[in-house]
Amino acid sequence: MFQLLSFLLSGEATAVERIITDACPVYAPFFGAMGVTAALVFTVMGAAYGTAKASVGISNMGVMKPDLVIKAFIPVIFAGVIAIYGLIICVILVGGIKPNANYTLMKSFTDLGAGLTVGLCGLAAGMAIGIVGDSGVRAFGQQPKLYVIMMLILIFSEALGLYGLIIGILLSSVSDTYCPGQALVPLNSGNVIGKN
């Protein structure tokens, strides 16, 4: 703050512009958009893997016991919820990206971190749901008493994605929208004036 004040008093508009550009660069929204992209891409990859892997087990089990297919469909639903976590954080992050307003580098990096957190946790959860769903459904087809155990393991696998969503929401709520000198307007002569 003292550095900004000394530049203001000296009238060096280029130095003030450099400080403003360092805090709120024009490329800051790129990192926020990458967070949105990472969240959706990774969670959808996890959901797709979980759905595909669990569906193979359901198909194999359904050949022998078609009456249990509806009950065995739960892992596919759990895998689909992972993609919804990614969609939730994407909507939150997109609402905070402001390319023409004050969007600091710190805020853009926390948005990127939020997107990566949700996305990678969703990818891991989707993989776990797929593997557990495939093996669990096959075991459930052989021994119906294993249904409760399969459900418990699926719930704990789903919780991995939920942990990522919670941390992603906390990261996205970081509110650093102050750009130094945001109320300053450089004049053509190189002088700097105060508030508009």
UniProtKB/Swiss-Prot annotation:
Sequence ranges on the Cytoplasmic membrane side: 47-72, 133-150
Instruction: Reply yes or no: does the keyword Transport apply.
Output: yes
Q: Which residues lie on this side of the membrane: Lumenal?
A: 1-25, 94-111, 172-196
The processes (GO biological process) annotated in the record are: asexual reproduction; calcium ion transport; sorocarp development
What cellular component terms from Gene Ontology apply here? Answer: contractile vacuolar membrane; membrane; proton-transporting V-type ATPase, V0 domain; vacuolar proton-transporting V-type ATPase complex
Q: Which Gene3D superfamilies match?
A: lithium bound rotor ring of v- atpase (1.20.120.610)
What is this entry's stated membrane topology?
Multi-pass membrane protein
Tell me the superkingdom of the source.
Answer: Eukaryota
Location of site Essential for proton translocation?
Answer: 158
Q: Establish whether keyword Nuclease is in the entry.
A: no
What CDD domains does the entry give? ATP-synt_Vo_c_ATP6C_rpt1, ATP-synt_Vo_c_ATP6C_rpt2
- Give this protein's Gene Ontology molecular function annotations: proton-transporting ATPase activity, rotational mechanism
Subcellular localization, as worded in the UniProt entry: Vacuole membrane
Pfam families in alphabetical order? ATP-synt_C (PF00137)
Q: Where are the transmembrane segments?
A: 26-46, 73-93, 112-132, 151-171
The UniProt keyword set, sorted, is: Hydrogen ion transport, Ion transport, Membrane, Transmembrane, Transmembrane helix, Transport, Vacuole
Q: Subunit comment for this entry?
A: V-ATPase is a heteromultimeric enzyme composed of a peripheral catalytic V1 complex (main components: subunits A, B, C, D, E, and F) attached to an integral membrane V0 proton pore complex (main component: the proteolipid protein; which is present as a hexamer that forms the proton-conducting pore).
Similarity comment? Belongs to the V-ATPase proteolipid subunit family.
Role noted for this protein:
Proton-conducting pore forming subunit of the membrane integral V0 complex of vacuolar ATPase. V-ATPase is responsible for acidifying a variety of intracellular compartments in eukaryotic cells.
Spell out the protein name for this chain.
Answer: V-type proton ATPase proteolipid subunit
What broad taxonomic lineage does this protein's source fall under?
Eukaryota, Amoebozoa, Evosea, Eumycetozoa, Dictyostelia
Gene for this protein?
A: vatP
